[in-house]
Amino acid sequence: MIVLVKFFVILKIKKTQLLLGFLLLSIYCDRPGEKIIIKGSTMGTSYVVKIVSNKDIETKKIKYSIDSILVKLNKQMSTWDPESEISKFNRWESLEPYDVSRQFYEVVESALYLSKKTNGMFDATVFDLLSLWGFGPNPKSGIPEKKNIDSILTLTGYENIICSNGTLMKKNRKAKLDLNAIAKGYGVDVVFDFLRTSGFENIFVEIGGEVKFSGYNFRDQNWTVGLENPISNQIDKQIPLFGVLKNEGCAIATSANYRNFVDLDGTILGHTINPKSGFPIQTDVLSVTVISKTCMESDGWATALMTMSYEQGASILSGNDSVSAIWLMRGADGLRYITMEGDINIIDPIYDIR
């Protein structure tokens, strides 16, 4: 009898331990558990995806899906691929409607919308202009002559492309598109949407510096994004960031000339071209960071605002509650300062905010 009682007590203790262990496991799994980082290459740059989830993450399967998405987008919008959708459209010299994929149409439609909002300072028809200045898949060499720039300007202008019922039409047979200023942002949005529809909530997606995120990071806090400090001397190299953004779910993109430039006969030129004058911009704006709901919108606005003075950009954004911007400026005295438009939470800025 004593043996049976002892056995019963031991059995009950083990059951209690199992139940307690199960409860502890359940509590643990209710919190963000598994954390993964996926890296790869796309659109001539790199991408990083971070996921925090309380469910099993099939990393290889997710990476395969992400790579498939990005390969498809690259095949649609890469001007470096002669067989891409955009390259074929650029060779099309007809005024008849041209059938395009849904995603390609969406990006072009958004580009034209942004062109109208910025009075043409964002222009996706600058393919030949960029090539003339040494950018793009078939760059020319040397500083171009003004007559050649003026000749190309007769072929550019967003008014030369029409979106209608899923097709594109050219008003000028020689018009050519370049979507590099908006395609990376669109790629971020598409990957982000794929992860959300796959059931993930704590996500961080970055392609070439353009980011979109939601939920919480690996430390169970809001995601943070560093604001890159443009390098112009040895002191700048010691201070890689000029501030940190700590916003809840949003999309962020930055445009600046320090990342992409070309050396033409000893002259260093940034890749941001004024689409109206045809010349690289000369400005006291060092960089523009834009925050909005979609990364495509942030990407496009950042490029557009980089072509303008701060006063012009702030005037256009005034009253636009869906877009916020941070300008890093160089003052007349050579000192840097920050100015902003919209609702922005910037932490630890190293320059004055004016």
Regions of interest found by a model, annotated:
Residues 2-13, 27-354:
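Mature catalytic core of soluble alpha/beta enzymes
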Residues 17-26:
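Bacterial N-terminal signal peptides
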